């Protein structure tokens, strides 16, 4: 700068600087998720997709890991940057428990490997171009995955959650193919998971749903946790209150009631009648109670076989002989219907299938009455 005047180079530098700053703020500030809300969404996805990985592993006969969720909020106008390659989109609508939908997105090459494994192939050299048979196989795999996820979400939110059969379509944002499946909301939440299938796939699988639906999930999660805390606190208060008045009063009153009749009986014969036998009668019931307890302890160590029956079906010999890897057997129970819990091959209860870490489990929902158990023995 000379004589308080800017040189041409300085003017150009200022113009270039202002131009670059004007190009940056393209996305306006909008409602976003806090760090705690992102963690909540990630935890929901972690639990639900943990069970989905188990279901997919059973279908593909491969080790499946779905881990490390990453939560981001993206505007719909930038969806092409988030999905630059051809994908396969699976649309899932909630029919009970929640009102909304989400989009499950996998790379087209990964979907081709999954489809090849589903129809009995080895997954190697799978053709990325998906036909109707391959799309149907992917749809069935995603149906099993999302069904398991809905069951896990029912456990997390303490209410029944059900979904409609998923719809599969090719998604290519650059060519505007399948974009009608993307939610119309301006702001979308993308939850990305690492997907590993044996030695064949090491990629990612993504969930996409509206920001408003994510807020509903978080709100329901917080409400279910607060309700559980209230349920655990209330029984403690009601249980402690009767202990204080009940324990001292009955012990004092019977002694006062027993003494007057004994004194009336001793008015004529005070010497021969004494209360000493009462002390021996107090010890006799205790000894009688302890004996069966020891006998019961011996029975409590007997192991019993517990079986959970998912369902049954009948097939002809021809159909059995035609079974191969990837075949699907339809059972006589509907999805979400309680399963039977058997002890030594006898039904004693009903429950819901849950996933505990990497293992299946059953939450008991109904215990059969004694009359029902007797009827099952006939």
From Swiss-Prot:
A GO molecular function annotation here is: cytoskeletal motor activity
| Keywords (A to Z) from UniProt | Cell membrane, Chemotaxis, Flagellar rotation, Hydrolase, Membrane
Against Gene3D superfamilies, the record matches this protein to: CheC-like, SpoA-like
Q: Where is the composition biased (Low complexity)?
A: 255-264
Spell out the residue ranges making up region: Disordered. 225-271
User: In which compartments does the protein localize?
Assistant: Cell membrane
* Membrane-topology descriptor: Peripheral membrane protein
Q: What does this protein do?
A: Component of the flagellar switch. Binds CheY-P and increases its hydrolysis rate in vitro. May function constitutively to remove CheY-P around the flagellar switch to maintain an optimal level of CheY-P whereas CheC may function after addition of an attractant to cope with increased levels of CheY-P.
Q: What is this protein called?
A: Flagellar motor switch phosphatase FliY
Tell me the classification of the organism that encodes this protein.
Answer: Bacteria, Bacillati, Bacillota, Bacilli, Bacillales
